[in-house]
Amino acid sequence: KNYLNDFDIRVKNIYIPKVDFLKKVIKKKINLLDLGCGAGHFLKALEQKGISATGYDTSVVLCKLGNKKLKKNKIYSANFEKIYEIIEDHSKFNTLSLIGVLEHLTEPHKLLNSFKKSKIKYLYILVPLFSLSTFLENSFPNVFPRQLSGDHTHLYTEKSLNYLAKKYKLKIIGEYWFGTDFPDLMRSLINTGNIMNKKIYTKELYEKFSKFIDDLQFVLDKNKVCSEVHLVFENKNF
């Protein structure tokens, strides 16, 4: 229940912009397969934008929670071995989305190879990058990590993503570099060290830097060294 309390807010603030980005890149009608969809936030955003989509996740609990929020789009439970088959067999979808999925896999190449063999035209991914946030998490080990959390097996870079595109004959047709490195820095400074008066410390920190934190972050985003990236690939294997 608590997981879904902010469901609509997250859909509006986080996932609707992802759909808007995808629609700008892919001009034709989208039929989407969302793997690792969790409780279906992205599916709900797609639904609100009139896009037909089906989601799969390994968590039965999240599938049930998500379906309570969805009207047309649906979520199904499947283990990962079945998911590889789903990618290769489903011809009705023209877009595959992996939102925060590849970094959790021990064998991401297996999934990418299934996409390569499929007749799905587009691949939309969101992955974490080796970035300032990564260094912060090493320097502030007592602050909860987002990039180096225990269930992340991979971080990516611009170079490694270009390598994957070349290896699997994919063309990058859309990219959106947008990170949270400087908000992570603020969070790390606030939640560590011997601070005599945390309230005053936090107030001073935000008064000094919050007005131009977006400008600072934009420098990293522009140079493609931010904490995450959205990429859309076109499958050039058929």
Predicted regions and their residues:
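Short, glycine-/aromatic-enriched active-site segment of Class I SAM-dependent methyltransferases
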Residues: 126-154, 159-164, 188-191
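Flexible, glycine-/basic-rich loop-and-beta segments that form/coincide
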Residues: 184, 191-197
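A short glycine-rich, Lys/Arg-flanked "PGG" loop and its adjoining helix->strand segment in the class I
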Residues: 109-124
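A short His-aromatic
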Residues: 100-104
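Conserved N-terminal segment of class I S-adenosyl-L-methionine
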Residues: 1-99, 109-113, 141, 174-178, ...
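Short catalytic/ligand-binding loop motif for oxyanion handling, primarily in non-cytosolic enzymes
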Residues: 41-43, 132-135, 181-187
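A SAM-dependent methyltransferase catalytic signature shared across enzymes that methylate proteins
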Residues: 159-176
